[in-house]
């Protein structure tokens, strides 16, 4: 079924809906007032694909937000250009209960869209193993994206993040 509006408008609306959902969740989940030191601005991704011969885009520019609820949980949402050179949006929650030195280990669970071979570009759920390093104003999320047959190509993805106030 084709929508009577341009695809960019639909994707833009999706991101607005995702952002609104994240903000509502942040508001409802907050035990205290907003703490700027818990807010990260995330860049897109650099993805080292396991199928390097498929002509996939490794540089995935984008912009997202991540808000740490506590030492183990954080919420995230954003938009980027995916490996198929399409616009994608995401929304999710990190759960990282394990520490290995300076690394936090766990998973991010959530939903993505924009992959033409996965659910016709629509939203789909994902559970992805992650590691995070954070120090002062800078951090790095590393995700092991599993392949999904011929629908989604696997990769080791790196996401830089920045916060204006260090803390937590």
PLM ranges: what are they?
Residues 1-36, 168:
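Cleavable N-terminal export/targeting peptides
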Residues 31-79, 89:
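Short glycine/proline- and aromatic-enriched beta-strand/turn motifs that initiate or cap beta-hairpins
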Residues 39, 71-75, 101-103, 136-142, ...:
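Repeated loop/turn-to-beta-strand initiation elements of outer-membrane beta-barrel proteins
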Residues 40, 45-47, 153-168:
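Outer-membrane beta-barrel "beta-signal"
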Residues 42-46, 76-78, 106-110, 141-145, ...:
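Transmembrane beta-strands of outer-membrane beta-barrel proteins
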Residues 43, 63-67, 77, 91-96, ...:
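Residues on the lipid-exposed face of transmembrane beta-strands in outer-membrane beta-barrel proteins
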Residues 50-58, 80-89, 99, 113-124, ...:
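Solvent-exposed loop/turn segments connecting transmembrane beta-strands
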Residues 105-114, 119-121, 128, 133-145:
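Outer membrane beta-barrel
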């Amino acid at each position: 079924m084709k929508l009577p509006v341009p695809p960019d408008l639909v994707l833009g609306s999706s991101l607005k809906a995702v952002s609104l959902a994240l903000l509502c969740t942040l508001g409802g989940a907050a035990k205290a007032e907003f703490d700027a030191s818990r807010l990260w601005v995330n860049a897109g991704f650099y993805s080292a694909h396991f199928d390097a011969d498929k002509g996939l885009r490794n540089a995935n520019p984008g912009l997202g937000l991540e808000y740490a609820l506590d030492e183990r949980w954080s919420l995230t949402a954003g938009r980027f250009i995916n490996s198929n050179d399409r616009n994608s949006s995401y929304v999710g929650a990190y759960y990282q209960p394990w520490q290995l030195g300076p690394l936090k280990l766990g998973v991010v669970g959530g939903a993505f869209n924009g992959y033409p071979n996965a659910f016709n570009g629509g939203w789909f759920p994902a559970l992805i193993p992650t590691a995070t390093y954070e120090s002062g104003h800078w951090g790095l999320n590393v995700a092991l994206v599993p392949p999904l047959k011929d629908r989604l190509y696997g990769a080791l993805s790196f996401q830089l993040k920045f916060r204006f106030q260090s803390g937590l």
